[in-house]
């Protein structure tokens, strides 16, 4: 009878877990569809447009052609060896899904919809992987909580909403699956689990440059266990299998190549691999000789190996056989390094330090359950707990110095918070007791009800907060911006697509477009036109050329752009409707990057006022007002307002017609409805041999043209 009841209870628990997990999977997907419901099925932001373009190339061509793809429509005139400079995991996975749906199941689905819905689908897989990982750390109840947290937590949703077709859409899934198999392998010594961890590590390497995090975290875990005296044959078989298979497999990715054995980023893994061989040998020798001799041999051996390792690594790095640390790595330890030495890295908003409120905004009450969970793991310090603690400490620091690394911190916050909350529920939701003194005291029951009820209420607030943040903050595609009319109605600002469509329909197919690198992928993806620079940022000098053109006087800019066969110049201007992400706000980064290459020609100080202010009104410096970007941004802007005095709603400064010098070398050919995107065409040389400035002055003196300008009806800022 008892066994039957136990069997029925076990079946019921299994069914209940399945139902809960189906609900979690549904919540993970549905919460990421706000962008499609509010806007449409569209690729978001910047990098996803390149990934989408590359995926289309893959499905229209063979995988061989994809790996050997040379793109002559980017980085003109240099081009880009695209197939050998990208992580193909995202594109190949999408192409496989598209092929399976279209050719195996006969569904006439477009590749764009596969790309748009890719991230929500894999978020469900992430929830499963987090469940399995947390179950290895504590138990199934903690695993379900962790899965529920990761399914809707804003810190992960920010990079996995529908349309966010970026590498992180699949990378966090692979991160958690790799860690799950690693913990299983470390606990059991299973070569199969270690092999699975290595294969998913290879998959991770193919999908995201952040694979280096795994490359260093797993060796750190092994190193800490060795220092704690917890070496075992299980640990040896798990790590050596993972490292050997994972390293060889990762070297098959063209973009990675020999980096695992020739880069400082990977040397920790190699060093721990060598160390664990020595420890294994020492463990064998320990049984053959006396303890005193063993200690002497081990101390001498470790000292010699440490010295030889440091000297060898330094020598190989000096000789160029091992690549030094990258600029992004240095910027993690010195937050001013990139700003001083590599401004192109510092100019990326994702590389800025995170503000403290962002931790609560992205994780809600999980952020204060997080340290409690880590503390509980310290109390019961198992080998797998050491991994979570190391993960927590490292990512807590890294997320504090770089915004984008909040994404890697979020999973361990969910895991640790689930451990803490599960422990609380284990105690306060257990209403069965054999102790009579608790049974006769209603205060104990009341305490349990209050504590458990409070945390259930916090869970409700967490769901409410996560839904609100997802809907309002993380579901905008950035190429279409939501705003409001003066009467409060929703208005969609579609200037980006309007401008790119104009370029696509009104310019020659081989036209070259100069714009700041932020918009290169979008121009290539939506306008299908050749660009000088894009978001790949592999050539700092080429980016500096565009920055120099924007910062130079008009005549000099014209010559620079003409040398590079540019036909059109595209600038983003937000002064009319209050869009703060425009080129004027990014202008100082353009100046700093170009100053790093041409310090004698471009000086940041020249763009400030005598008082050291960055201004765009009548008090702006002459260098600022004569720069090409200033002229293109503010051309005809004051004439929009009665009396000729316009207010830049981003900088909150007054602009008059006298503040804006005329343009003589460029023709305005397009300005979007809300003046966010402005496109100019380089003028042809004068047929009579006159300079374009002389022609412009003659035209202004002989005629006075009036332009009919319509102001948009948007009354609120973006």
Swiss-Prot record:
Effect seen on changing residue 163 to R? Temperature sensitive and staurosporine sensitive
Where in or outside the cell it occurs: the entry states:
Endoplasmic reticulum membrane
Q: Where is this motif: DK motif?
A: 583-590
Q: Where is this motif: DXD motif 1?
A: 45-47
Q: What is the effect of changing residue 210 to D?
A: Temperature sensitive and staurosporine sensitive
Q: Motif SVSE motif located where?
A: 347-350
Q: Mind telling me what this protein is named?
A: Dolichyl-diphosphooligosaccharide--protein glycosyltransferase subunit STT3
């Amino acid at each position: 009878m008892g066994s039957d009841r136990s069997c029925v209870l076990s079946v019921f628990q299994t069914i209940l877990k399945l139902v809960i997990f189906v609900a979690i999977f549904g919540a993970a997907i549905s919460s990421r569809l706000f962008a499609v419901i509010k806007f449409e099925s569209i690729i978001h932001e910047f990098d996803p447009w390149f990934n989408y373009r590359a995926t289309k190339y893959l499905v229209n061509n063979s995988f061989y052609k994809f790996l050997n793809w040379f793109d002559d429509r980017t980085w003109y005139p240099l081009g880009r060896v695209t197939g050998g400079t990208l992580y193909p995991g995202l594109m190949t996975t999408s192409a496989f899904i598209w092929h399976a749906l279209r050719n195996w199941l006969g569904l006439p689905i477009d590749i764009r919809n596969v790309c748009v819905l890719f991230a929500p689908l894999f978020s469900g897989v992430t929830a499963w992987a987090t469940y399995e990982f947390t179950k290895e750390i504590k138990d199934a109840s903690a695993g379900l909580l962790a899965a529920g947290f990761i399914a809707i937590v804003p810190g992960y949703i920010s990079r996995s909403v529908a349309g966010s077709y970026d590498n992180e859409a699949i990378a966090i899934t692979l991160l958690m699956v790799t860690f799950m198999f690693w913990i299983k392998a470390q606990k059991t010594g299973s070569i199969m689990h270690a092999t699975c961890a290595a294969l998913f590590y290879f998959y991770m390497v193919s999908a995201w440059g952040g694979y280096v995090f795994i490359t260093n975290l797993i060796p750190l875990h092994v190193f800490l266990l060795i220092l704690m005296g917890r070496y075992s044959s299980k640990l040896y078989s798990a790590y050596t299998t993972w490292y050997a298979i994972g390293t060889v497999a990762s070297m098959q990715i063209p973009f990675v190549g020999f980096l695992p054995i020739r880069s400082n980023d990977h040397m920790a893994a190699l060093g721990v691999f060598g160390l664990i061989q020595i420890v294994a040998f020492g463990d064998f020798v320990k049984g053959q000789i006396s303890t005193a001799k063993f200690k002497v041999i081990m101390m001498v051996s470790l000292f010699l190996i440490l010295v030889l390792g440091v000297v060898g690594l330094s020598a190989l790095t000096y000789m160029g056989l091992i690549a030094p640390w990258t600029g992004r790595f240095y910027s993690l330890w010195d937050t001013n390094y990139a700003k001083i030495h590599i401004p192109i890295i510092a100019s990326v908003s994702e590389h800025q330090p995170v503000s403290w409120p962002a931790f609560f905004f992205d994780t809600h009450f999980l952020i204060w359950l997080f340290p409690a969970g880590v503390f509980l793991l310290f109390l019961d310090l198992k080998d797998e707990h050491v991994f979570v603690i190391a993960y927590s400490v490292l990512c807590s620091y890294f997320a504090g110095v770089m915004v984008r690394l909040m994404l890697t911190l979020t999973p361990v916050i969910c895991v640790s918070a689930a451990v803490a909350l599960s422990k609380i529920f284990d105690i306060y939701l257990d209403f069965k007791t054999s102790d009579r003194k608790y049974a006769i005291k209603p205060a104990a029951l009341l305490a349990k009800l209050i504590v458990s009820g409070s945390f259930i209420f916090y869970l409700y607030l967490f769901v409410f907060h996560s839904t609100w943040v997802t809907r309002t903050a993380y579901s905008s595609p950035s190429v279409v911006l939501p705003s409001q009319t003066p009467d409060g109605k929703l208005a969609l600002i579609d200037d980006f697509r309007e401008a790119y469509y104009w370029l696509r329909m009104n310019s020659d197919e081989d036209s070259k477009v100069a714009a700041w690198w932020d918009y290169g992928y979008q121009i290539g993806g939506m306008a299908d036109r050749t660009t000088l620079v894009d978001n790949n940022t592999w050539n700092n000098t080429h980016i500096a050329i565009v920055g120099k053109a924007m910062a130079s006087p008009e005549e000099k800019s014209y010559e620079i752009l003409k040398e590079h066969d540019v036909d059109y110049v595209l600038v983003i201007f937000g002064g009319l409707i209050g869009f703060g992400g425009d080129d004027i706000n990014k202008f100082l980064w353009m100046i700093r990057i170009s100053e790093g290459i041409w310090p004698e020609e471009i000086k940041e100080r020249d763009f400030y006022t005598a008082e050291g202010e960055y201004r765009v009104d009548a008090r702006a410096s002459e260098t600022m007002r004569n720069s090409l970007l200033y002229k293109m941004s503010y051309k005809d802007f004051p004439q929009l307002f009665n009396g000729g005095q316009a207010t830049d709603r981003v900088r909150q400064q007054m602009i008059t017609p006298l503040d804006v010098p005329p343009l003589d070398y460029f023709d305005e050919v397009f300005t979007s409805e809300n003046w966010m995107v402005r496109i100019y065409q380089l003028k042809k040389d004068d047929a009579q041999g006159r300079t374009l400035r002389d022609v412009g002055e003659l035209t202004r003196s002989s005629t006075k043209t009036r332009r009919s300008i319509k102001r948009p009806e948007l009354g609120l800022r973006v």
